[in-house]
Amino acid sequence: MSDMATENLDIDYTKYDFKDSTEMYVHLSKKGLSKETVIEISKMKKEPQWMLDFRLRSFEIFMKKPMPTWGGDLSTIDFQNIYYYAKASDKTEKNWDDVPDNVKKTFDKLGIPEAEKKFLAGVGAQYESEVVYHSLREDLAKQGVLFLDTDQALIDHPEMFKKYFGKIIPPEDNKFAALNSAVWSG
């Protein structure tokens, strides 16, 4: 993006400059990207073998593809200093009041509850690697509307999921599509 495109914008980025302690997670992967990390994520999610195979193939593609050079300088990214899976809660809540307080505080800072009340028919709130809150208007659910996070869709509709997952932007598309396909969550 050119400087001209952003020079007149008055954006306060400090609003989003916060993070939580890693001690609050019910599960946190080791830092670093490896075949073992990819396997750990799949095992934590109790995924079918085909998904583990997809993840591992995507990881191999990621390792072989060069860093893109068409955008900003990404050479300083340390892929071994990243947690690729962090689970903040043991379950997905249907009532916002039941979401853990530390997670609610983060979403309150971002204005998520207000956005749902004002504009959305359904919402899934993802915190780190997992969905912690999921809501769909009852009238839409009765009409057969499916609104699921990807983890639940994989469980509830495995054939549909397998048919469409990773098709629009396949892991072969670019290095970061491959990374996403290897370690996706939520």
Please identify what each model-predicted range represents.
Residues 2-186:
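Glycine-rich and polybasic anion-binding loops at the starts of cofactor/ligand-binding domains
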